[in-house]
Amino acid sequence: MDRAADLWTLVSNLKNAAHDEQVHILQMLGDKLINDCRIEVFGVTIEPLWVEAYCYDETRFPDQNTHRSSKQKNRFGQLYFHERGYGGVDICLSNSEDFCLSFLLKATLANGHFLTQTQLPRALLSTGKTKADFEHLEDILHPANARHTICHTTRVNLAKPCYSDAPLTSFALDAIPKYDFRFARKNLRENVRAYLLAYMAAHPDCTEQECRAECFRVFGWVPDLVRTWVHN
């Protein structure tokens, strides 16, 4: 499919890109996974809503938070079930043995049901298929046209500080108030702050209550810091 080819081209461009461009390419890949692709496996349709990029290239992108599993190398378009940590499922996009690249499916819709990182593998395995069955599947990326509003932020609960400030998460902003994204609230604070400052600039006479209502409308919750942001 053309959209898988687009992903492949971006991945191929990643290796020789400068650092800032690498981050941009990883964001573009995440954006395309959310808006342009769905994953079809054994009758389960997975629609990504929040994905996090994990890339390891020893000389050009040494992200120690990447598991560096062999299943994150040269397995473009195949699933990787985590072998350690909290548990989870990634879609591998590496097309070479030279580097690891996969995207954690942190929040998804699976056959229309909202699932978090640890819920997704349980849901998949409840089909009666094994991890190996899922990981052996190929050609699981299919075209989608989701048209979400995509934003970026940092990754959640990193074990190591490297690339912790890099905006390597892509997420569907319009999904945030609809589903339970409490796991992401710490990482979303800066997004909320930036949105609120822009809102106040466009509505200079808005009250604190109006700002709180707007935050809730867009993000589904109101950080405690809203009062500080409004009155400073």
Predicted regions, residues:
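A cross-family signal for N-terminal binding/gating loops and helix N-caps
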Residues: M1-E190
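Basic, alpha-helical nucleic-acid-binding regions used in initiation and control of genome expression
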Residues: L188-N232
